[in-house]
Amino acid sequence: MPFSVAHMERIEVDQEEVLAHENWLKMLEVQSHAGPCVTGFRLLKPVIAFGFVPIWQGVAEAWMVGSADARKYPITMTKTGRAVMDIAKISMGLHRLQITVRNTDKRAESWAYAIGFGQESVMKKYGPDGEDYLMMTRF
């Protein structure tokens, strides 16, 4: 379903990197206008959202916000994550798709590998809280 910030008001977000942004809902609203984004539902409840911000021709950065409910279905979420990334890459004509992952969030890093991303670099003090982040890419 097309993304709406109202969906996020119904998701129990526990991602430290999202919550570190004081106005994270406003940030998502702005990003949602920059490129395609969708919300995934289970039993009429939003559980995950994906978005893509074009940087320039052929390159975009993806974002994802998930709920604790989404983690109850790891196989489904991983297959969905791969499919959404594939669809975005094809439909947007991308030769590079990138994400940032908080360096201390090993669960998110592992999931990024599972959906086809590889580590490119460490971005020192990149986060809003001064934490290091990984730049991960998918070609």
List where the protein language model places each region.
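Charged interaction scaffolds used for protein-protein
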Residues: 31-34, 41, 57-59, 80, ...
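Conserved acetyl-CoA-binding loop-helix of GNAT-fold acetyltransferases
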Residues: 73-89, 110, 114
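Short amphipathic alpha-helix that is part of the acyltransferase structural core
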Residues: 1-24
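Conserved beta-strand-loop-alpha-helix junction that forms the acyl-donor binding cleft
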Residues: 94-113, 126-127
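Conserved beta-strand in the GNAT
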Residues: 39, 44-54, 60-63
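Conserved catalytic-core motifs of GNAT/GCN5-like acyltransferases
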Residues: 100, 118-133
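Active-site rim helix/loop that mediates acceptor-substrate recognition in acyltransferases
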Residues: 18-37
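Conserved acetyl-CoA binding element of GNAT-fold acetyltransferases
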Residues: 58-78, 134
